[in-house]
Regions:
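NTP-dependent small-molecule kinase module
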Residues: 2, 18, 26, 133-168
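Post-Walker A helix-loop "phosphate-sensing" segment adjacent to the P-loop in P-loop NTPases
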Residues: 25-34
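Short glycine-rich anion-binding loops that position phosphate/pyrophosphate groups of nucleotides
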Residues: 79-82, 102-104, 149
Length: 168
């Protein structure tokens, strides 16, 4: 069974997908995004939430996590994936990069309606992040702050760590 070089976690709009794609490109490996897996099979996340509800989405997200953790390369988990106890347990055996971001830095990213749990803006994002902070911390091998750097710089910082930690 394959295992990812790194799993990227963090709150909604922290930049997990963009950073993960850059990491994968730099490492010459694939990138698997669990949100994309769910969307490919079940449709847009806001529509899933509206029609089926969050519990249905979380079930499908868990299946996507299982699939993604069986691949090599870089894996980006959806912001809420760490809420699942089995996912947290599964991550114990993986190199996990936690991307953090300040409310001020994330605010401009919250203007769209693609994120059903933070559609009410910054205050709902803050509450959501506060409710998950301990879960993110519990799975993180290392934290990286995205608040004051570009996606490319953040990806480079994580890349250095992965190469050093994996002996690449």
């Amino acid at each position: 069974m394959s295992t990812p070089l790194v799993v990227v976690v963090g709150p909604p709009a922290a930049g997990k997908t963009r950073v993960s794609k850059r990491l994968a490109k730099a490492l010459g490996v694939s990138c698997v995004d669990t949100d994309a897996l769910v969307v490919n099979q079940w449709g847009p996340i806001p529509e899933i939430f509206a029609a089926q509800g969050e519990p249905f989405f979380r079930e499908k997200e868990r299946l996507a996590v299982i699939e993604a953790l069986g691949t090599s390369g870089v894996v980006a988990l959806g912001g809420g994936a760490v809420m699942d106890a089995q996912t947290r347990e599964d991550l114990e055996d993986h190199r996990v990069a936690l991307i953090t971001i300040s409310p001020e830095a994330v605010a401009p990213r919250l203007d769209n309606q693609k994120r059903p749990l933070v559609k009410d803006g910054l205050e709902s994002w803050k509450a959501l992040v506060a409710s998950r902070a301990d879960l993110y911390d519990s799975v993180a091998s290392r934290k990286f702050d995205a608040s004051h750097q570009t996606v490319d710089n953040l990806a480079e910082e994580i890349l250095r760590w992965v190469r050093e930690d994996a002996g690449l």
